[in-house]
Amino acid sequence: MQKIRKGDSVVVLSGKDKGRKGEVLKVMPKDEQALVSGINIVKRHQRQTQTQEAGIISKEAPIHLSNLAIADPKDGKPTRVGFRVEDGKKVRVAKRSGALIDG
């Protein structure tokens, strides 16, 4: 079971977006990276196609999972993730507050 999943609210721990929060759009486990909305924005020069115009577009670039932490459901601060078995199912738990992480 992954600690960070699509749809999770995360906090950036290091880099140019340190301290900012966003929602995980996509997780790439093989590369140990994730796409987070509004985080690690880069500009790409887009060549013209039949459907798109040419120009400079801004989009999210992947960020390494080690630079992300789950936001605690209670106070929004970064927390580590633990696991617990409840009703025969393995669930994620915030180490900071003990709250269950939805997902």
From Swiss-Prot:
GO terms under biological process: translation
Lineage top rank: taxon: Bacteria
Disulfide bonds: none
Keywords, in A-Z order: Ribonucleoprotein, Ribosomal protein, RNA-binding, rRNA-binding
Record bears the keyword GTP-binding: no
GO function term, MF aspect, one: structural constituent of ribosome
Pfam families on file: KOW, ribosomal_L24
Keyword Cell wall biogenesis/degradation: no
CC terms in the record's Gene Ontology section: ribonucleoprotein complex; ribosome
CDD domains in UniProt: KOW_RPL26 (cd06089)
Function of the protein: One of two assembly initiator proteins, it binds directly to the 5'-end of the 23S rRNA, where it nucleates assembly of the 50S subunit.
Family: Belongs to the universal ribosomal protein uL24 family.
Assembly and oligomerization: Part of the 50S ribosomal subunit.
PANTHER family assigned: MITOCHONDRIAL RIBOSOMAL PROTEIN L24 (PTHR12903)
NCBIfam families given in the database record: rplX_bact (TIGR01079)
Protein name: Large ribosomal subunit protein uL24
Organism (species): Brucella canis (strain ATCC 23365 / NCTC 10854 / RM-666)
Gene responsible for this protein: rplX
